A protein has these predicted regions:
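Domain-level signature for soluble enzymes in the chorismate/prephenate branch of the shikimate pathway
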Residues: 1-96
């Protein structure tokens, strides 16, 4: 019985690991695009609250099985922070 549970747990964790790999690949691609945006907007502010609100609104209108507004907002708030910091650092490096 315990061996079956351990095997099931191992399989589920392998699925999570695969999803984590996909998520990190997607985040890396998102940052690549964010860098392109930062280069275009060099003279403009990086922070665009209107755009962030639009993204959150669009995502909150999607139908998810388990994601709710609180989870989406929390997750994307962190994604936005990471993206802004990445853009800021990239632009600082260009100015050196």
């Amino acid at each position: 019985m315990q061996k079956n549970l351990d095997s099931l747990l191992e399989n589920l964790r392998a699925e999570i690991d695969a999803l984590d790999n996909e998520l990190s690949d997607l985040l890396d691609k998102r940052l690549e695009i964010a860098l392109k945006i930062a280069l275009i907007k060099q003279k403009s502010p990086i922070y665009c609250p209107k755009r962030e609100r639009e993204i959150l609104k669009r995502l909150s209108q999607r139908d998810f099985k388990h994601l709710n507004g609180e989870i989406l907002t929390g997750f994307y708030t962190e994604v936005f922070k990471i993206s802004r910091k990445f853009q800021e650092n990239a632009l600082k490096e260009l100015k050196k």
